[in-house]
């Protein structure tokens, strides 16, 4: 993340195509070290691409990802107390535990595809 943040800072500073040295100097200015492998990967993936278009494409992809917020079942409303009313039985639900797959970690898409 810090490599991406440094890259974006360079772009915001007016450098439309930051180099590895540009990103490294930004990271070193705050006492952070650059991971060479991640830096080279980032630079190769963003080579000849407009960062605003990359961000727009990312937003579009994220808009298609479900973010939870599903309906919540609150159950039936409580019955008015009556003399002969039997207590409502509670239905027990079993929760299935699903194993998390590797592809679930990136929510089904790569940052640079």
UniProtKB/Swiss-Prot annotation:
Q: Which InterPro entries match?
A: P1/P2_N_sf (IPR038716), Ribosomal_P1/P2 (IPR027534), Ribosomal_P2 (IPR044076)
What is known about its processing and modification? Phosphorylated.
Q: Where is the composition biased (Basic and acidic residues)?
A: 89-99
User: What does the record give under GO molecular function?
Assistant: protein-containing complex binding; structural constituent of ribosome
- One BP term from GO: cytoplasmic translational elongation
- Gene Ontology CC entries for this record: cytosolic large ribosomal subunit
Q: Which UniProt keywords apply?
A: Phosphoprotein, Ribonucleoprotein, Ribosomal protein
Metal-binding as a keyword? no
Keyword presence, Phosphoprotein: yes
Return the Gene3D superfamilies for the record.
1.10.10.1410
Domain of life according to the entry: Eukaryota
Which region ranges are annotated with the description Disordered? 66-113
Q: How does it assemble?
A: P1 and P2 exist as dimers at the large ribosomal subunit.
Task: Briefly state the protein's biological role.
Answer: Plays an important role in the elongation step of protein synthesis.
PANTHER family the UniProt entry points to: 60S ACIDIC RIBOSOMAL PROTEIN FAMILY MEMBER, LARGE RIBOSOMAL SUBUNIT PROTEIN P2
- The protein's name is Large ribosomal subunit protein P2B
The gene is RPP2B
């Amino acid at each position: 993340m810090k490599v991406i943040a440094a890259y974006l800072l360079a772009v915001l500073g007016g450098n439309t195509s930051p180099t590895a040295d540009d990103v490294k100097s930004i990271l070193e200015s705050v006492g952070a070290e650059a991971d060479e492998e991640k830096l080279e990967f980032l630079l190769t993936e963003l080579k000849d691409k407009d960062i605003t278009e990359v961000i727009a494409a990312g937003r579009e992809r994220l808009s298609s990802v479900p973010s939870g917020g599903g309906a919540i079942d609150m159950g039936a409303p409580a019955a008015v107390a009556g003399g002969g009313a039997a207590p409502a039985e509670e239905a027990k639900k079993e929760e299935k535990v699903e194993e998390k797959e590797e592809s679930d970690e990136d929510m089904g898409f790569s940052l640079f595809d």
